[in-house]
Design a protein with these regions (language model features):
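Elongated, amphipathic alpha-helical interaction scaffolds
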Residues: 1-326
Length: 326
C-alpha cells in the first residue's frame, strides 16, 4: 500500500475538502483548534474538491473552506514553499473572507467570525519552539481582547513537530504525523487506524484509489515542489562555493601586497604578519560579498528579493539596491 503526500494543495483538498470528507474535517479541526474537544459537530464544505477532467488543469486548489454550525467560517491552507509576502497573504485572505460576507443593505452585526488555519512545511516563527501558535486582536499595552474576536489566525509549523509513531499522544499529534509521514508508510499504523476519520483519510490518500488523471496532477505538484527546492539549494551551494574560492584568492593577493607595504614602514616582521592576517580577512569578506552580489544579480529575474537574500546571504535591502541598478 502506498499513500500520496497530503501536503500538496491538490492532495490536501482531496482529503479534507471532498464531499465525503465532512467527518474527516470535523475531527481535524476539533483536534487542531479546540484541543480535541467536540466543539464542531457539523459543518458545510464550501466549494468542495472536484476531480480533474482534463490534463493541464490550472492550480485551483488554494485551500479548504468550511462553514461551521454556528455560522463561523474556517479557511484552511497548506503551504509547502516559503514565498515572499506569505504572512501578508494569510492576513489578506482572512480579512477578505470576513469583509465579503455582507450583501448591500445587510447589517454589520450579521458578520460571522473567521478562523484562518495555516499549515506550513517550513518554519515561520523561529523565535517560538512550539509547532502551533494563534493570533487575535488585542489591546497593545494591557493585552486585553478586542470586544469582537471575529478574526483568528492559527499557524501550525510542521518542521517543529518531530515525534515518532510510538511517541504520539492524542488525535492532534496523529493528524500532524499523518501530514508529515503518510508518503513514507506502507500500511496504516494500528494506533492511527483506531481513529475512524484518520483511517478514512489514509484510504482517500491511497494511491490505488486515485484515477490516472489525479495521479498525474499529484505527480506534477510534487515535481514542481522538488524543482523549486532544487533551484534554491543549488543556487545557495554555488554562491557559497564561488564566494569562498574568490575570497581566498583575493585575500592572498591583498594580504601579500599590504603585508609588504606595512612591513617596510613598521618593520618587516610585524608588517608581514599583520598584513597577511588583515589582508586575508578583508579579502575574504570583500570577495565573498562581491560573489554574493554576482549570484544575486543572476537570480533577479527568477526570484523575489526575500528568496534571493536567503540564498546569497545578502540583506533584502542590498538585493533591492541591485534590482534598482539593473
Amino acid at each position: 500500500m502506498r499513500f500520496i503526500n497530503p501536503k500538496t494543495d491538490f492532495a490536501f483538498k482531496k482529503i479534507f475538502g471532498s464531499d465525503q470528507s465532512k467527518a474527516i474535517l470535523i475531527s481535524f479541526l476539533n483536534a487542531l483548534l479546540y484541543q480535541e474537544r467536540p466543539v464542531i459537530v457539523d459543518l458545510e464544505i464550501i466549494d468542495p474538491y472536484l476531480a480533474p477532467k482534463i490534463q493541464g488543469m490550472k492550480d485551483t486548489f488554494v485551500d479548504v473552506r468550511a462553514r461551521l454550525q454556528d455560522g463561523r467560517k474556517v479557511i484552511i491552507e497548506m503551504q509547502v514553499l516559503n514565498v515572499e509576502g506569505f504572512e501578508k497573504r494569510v492576513l489578506y485572505n482572512a480579512a477578505k473572507a470576513y469583509s465579503t460576507q455582507l450583501m448591500v443593505g445587510e447589517s454589520y452585526k450579521d458578520l460571522s467570525a473567521v478562523v484562518a488555519l495555516t499549515i506550513t512545511d517550513f518554519v515561520m516563527f523561529p523565535e517560538w519552539p512550539e509547532a502551533q501558535s494563534a493570533y487575535m486582536l488585542k489591546e497593545k499595552e494591557r493585552l486585553t481582547d478586542y470586544p469582537e474576536g471575529d478574526l483568528e489566525l492559527v499557524f501550525v509549523e510542521l518542521p517543529k513537530f518531530r515525534k515518532e509513531l510510538e511517541e504520539l499522544v492524542g488525535v492532534k499529534e496523529k493528524w500532524l504525523y499523518f501530514l508529515q509521514k503518510a508518503p513514507d508508510l506502507e500500511v496504516i499504523p494500528e494506533t492511527m487506524g483506531e481513529i475512524a476519520e484518520i483511517r478514512a483519510a489514509f484510504q482517500i490518500a491511497n494511491v490505488a484509489s486515485l484515477s490516472p488523471e489525479e495521479l498525474e496532477v499529484q505527480e506534477r505538484k510534487m515535481m514542481y515542489i522538488y524543482d523549486q527546492r532544487g533551484v534554491q539549494s543549488k543556487a545557495r551551494a554555488e554562491g557559497r562555493a564561488e564566494g569562498r574560492a574568490e575570497g581566498r584568492a583575493e585575500g592572498r593577493a591583498e594580504g601579500r601586497a599590504e603585508g609588504r607595504a606595512e612591513g617596510r614602514a613598521e618593520g618587516r616582521a610585524e608588517g608581514r604578519a599583520e598584513g597577511r592576517a588583515e589582508g586575508r580577512a578583508e579579502g575574504r569578506a570583500e570577495g565573498q560579498e562581491e560573489k554574493a552580489k554576482e549570484v544575486a544579480r543572476r537570480l533577479l529575474g527568477q526570484m523575489t528579493d526575500q528568496q534571493i537574500a536567503e540564498i546569497s546571504g545578502l540583506t533584502v535591502a542590498q538585493v533591492a539596491v541591485l534590482r534598482a541598478e539593473k
